Amino acid sequence: MEIVWEVLFLLQANFIVCISAQQNSPKIHEGWWAYKEVVQGSFVPVPSFWGLVNSAWNLCSVGKRQSPVNIETSHMIFDPFLTPLRINTGGRKVSGTMYNTGRHVSLRLDKEHLVNISGGPMTYSHRLEEIRLHFGSEDSQGSEHLLNGQAFSGEVQLIHYNHELYTNVTEAAKSPNGLVVVSIFIKVSDSSNPFLNRMLNRDTITRITYKNDAYLLQGLNIEELYPETSSFITYDGSMTIPPCYETASWIIMNKPVYITRMQMHSLRLLSQNQPSQIFLSMSDNFRPVQPLNNRCIRTNINFSLQGKDCPNNRAQKLQYRVNEWLLK
């Protein structure tokens, strides 16, 4: 029997065109690092070494506001000043290129189709730059964030940059108030989220089997990716890949989205390498959770008990019951 929170938690396209990634793909997620050993006996820095092999990545080791984290629901704080998220697509569907980066499935939007987000913990409007998928080799793992110590089968991360202050995501990523990442947990089910179904159907996902493969998707509705909830959890953290800049506000939606078992199997068949190299599954592409270090985890879910956990003492402490939503 599946569990869902009573607090509610957590958190067709017209045509598809193939493109050449080798010629046109941006240099994304570059650098000498990995989530796991690439080949047994070889050394490519895994997460525990990221901050040791490159001085520019030292925050990966010494930072105190790192992501992901384990969300302990008993420690969450109600913040009455958190407003609902507002997604502005301009009433248009968008196009984007889906890449196999060797580490992630990454969907990057066409620059002619802008999607902005505001509200929630944000003072500024932020522009969607990338949608990134994390997933496990088995259903019991795959998400970067944990809920009461439990992982989910995957996690969708929508990475936005502050376009009011910065000209691009590279500048924003290393600057104050630079990034907002919306995170949505993935569970395996008999049905599929309509947006993820576009990304993960067989005709699409098999086009990006190997590293540097790319595929163009058109007629995408970003709002279809979001679960049917206005509730979320938020905290201040970092990028979860090197250089681990501590410039990200995280928003974790309070319901999961679903993909089918066949779609998850297709993800696990994606290779970290190019066709001429040994096959290594992209799965288990998640960073281990990092210490919370006294950071507040806030929510817009209203509960009645007063709490003193938050430094500004303006919030209320969460009181929750496990329902039939997420946990098992």
From Swiss-Prot:
PROSITE patterns associated with the record: ALPHA_CA_2
InterPro entries tied to this protein: Alpha_CARP_X/XI, CA_dom, CA_dom_sf, Carbonic_anhydrase_a-class
Matching SUPFAM superfamilies: Carbonic anhydrase
A GO biological-process term: brain development
Tissue expression as described in the entry: Strong expression in brain and central nervous system.
Domain Alpha-carbonic anhydrase: residue ranges: 31-301
Gene3D superfamilies named in the record: Alpha carbonic anhydrase
GO MF: carbonate dehydratase activity; hydro-lyase activity; zinc ion binding
Role according to the record: Does not have a catalytic activity.
Protein name per the record: Carbonic anhydrase-related protein 10
Organism encoding this protein: Homo sapiens (Human)
Gene: CA10
